[in-house]
Amino acid sequence: MLLAGPSGAGKTMLVHAICTELGATLFDLTATNIVGKYPGKSGLNMLLHLVIKVSKLLQPAIIYIDRAEKTFLKKVSKTDKSDPKRLKKDLPRLVRSLTSEDRVMLIGVSRSPWECEQKVILQSKASLIHSRNINLTIYRV
């Protein structure tokens, strides 16, 4: 699921409310949280393996990525040290590892989803939720 809306609209609060309501464990894979941790390709593979295994053990679980559009940017700013495209190749593997029986949800939050590669959004078959403060608009992509 992708939550999209302007800064301060309550997207992150909605994710926390979902976690609270479901009693779900939150795994935050935001690029700024994992920068410098689990270095290299093997480190990232280990991180994703741990997140998949532990999220399935602690169901219900939510895997959360803030500023998700940065993962799929066409061109990353040279000043951005968080290496946001690090998850790009491995994120589909994470999604494929989840089955319909798993109570694990991947939620991305974005201020500007139009900045990412449109092909990725169209291939994801995800729901796009656009929030303008309290009003929510749900689109099925």
Go through each PLM region and give its residues.
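Walker A/P-loop NTP-binding motif of AAA+ ATPase domains
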Residues: 1-141
